Amino acid sequence: MSTGNVYQELIRRYLVVVKKLYEEPIPQTARQRRRRKQQLRTRRAQLRELEGRILKQILDRGPDQLCQGVTNLALAEKSESSN
């Protein structure tokens, strides 16, 4: 699997976990609240792990790729603001 595909898969997993954080209904009973609290702790731990892996992927890329990515982001923001 190429580096780009690994990075995209990590981002996809991250977004799935973030979506799960905010999608569930608000718990009503104490048991549901305890379960929800544990699920939140688990998901936040998953997010921290994925953030670390994403950061590692970014840092493992060469400085040229990183600079090019930052330049592309700046150009995209500039074109969005002009529209």
Curated annotation (Swiss-Prot):
Q: Where in the cell is it found?
A: Host nucleus, Host nucleolus; Host cytoplasm
Q: Where is this region: Homomultimerization?
A: 17-24
What keywords are assigned to this protein?
Host cytoplasm, Host nucleus, mRNA transport, RNA-binding, Transport
> Where do we find the motif Nuclear localization signal and RNA-binding (RRE) here?
29-45
One Gene Ontology term, aspect cellular component: host cell cytoplasm
One annotated GO molecular function is:
RNA binding
* Motif mapping: Nuclear export signal: 65-76
Q: What is its main location?
A: host cell
Name the GO terms of the biological process aspect: mRNA transport
Q: What does this protein do?
A: Escorts unspliced or incompletely spliced viral pre-mRNAs (late transcripts) out of the nucleus of infected cells. These pre-mRNAs carry a recognition sequence called Rev responsive element (RRE) located in the env gene, that is not present in fully spliced viral mRNAs (early transcripts). This function is essential since most viral proteins are translated from unspliced or partially spliced pre-mRNAs which cannot exit the nucleus by the pathway used by fully processed cellular mRNAs.
Subunit comment: Homomultimer; when bound to the RRE. Multimeric assembly is essential for activity.
Per the entry's comment, what about the domains?
The RNA-binding motif binds to the RRE, a stem-and-loop structure present in incompletely spliced viral pre-mRNAs. This region also contains the NLS which mediates nuclear localization. These overlapping functions prevent Rev bound to RRE from undesirable return to the nucleus. When Rev binds the RRE, the NLS becomes masked while the NES remains accessible.
What is the protein named?
Protein Rev
Can you name the source organism?
Answer: Simian immunodeficiency virus (isolate GB1)
Lineage here is: Viruses, Riboviria, Pararnavirae, Artverviricota, Revtraviricetes
